[in-house]
Amino acid sequence: RAYAPVLASPYSAGEGKVAVKVVSDRMERFEGELEAYVMGLDGKVMKKMTAGCKVEANSGADFIEIDGADLEGDAFLYVRLTEDGELISENTFFTRYPNRYDWGEPAIDIEVSETTDCYELTLSTDRIARCTYLYTDNENDCFEDNYIDLIPGFPRKVAVRSNMTYDNFNTTLKYQT
């Protein structure tokens, strides 16, 4: 999320390199773990890198650098930043325009569970599902996040506040990729 206080941000660093910067708007030092995956659209991990991150207050620093040649073809970069084991930022990086990729048709699985104050969706996919839009027929439903990228091998949880019954919610829940 662009407005989060700490972000993992991959960018083109020139000379055929891609770097991952961790940027913190916090007023205290940040420490976390950065993971970077070079993946195929089918979810195959071709390369994994990790780095411990220590970022001073209100600043940023580069932690991982990748050779752009690793991102040729239908490969992309997926980065995850955790703090005390909790995911606080994730991002993707593509080296080409979207219409240059063979995205294929993802098979998306959605499990719905009921909590005391909302429904919790657990979404997974067999291949990358870019720009997945989640919605229901009820305009009053409030999705924590309804426009997401789904990455194979990394299930995504989304909370939804709804006044519908569990059965009605399940039958009206839809997605579009």
Walk through the language-model features, giving the residues of each.
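Carbohydrate-binding surfaces of carbohydrate-active enzymes
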Residues: R1-D145, L150-A159
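Short, surface-exposed ligand- or partner-binding patches at beta-edge/loop junctions that are enriched
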Residues: L71-T82, N163-T177
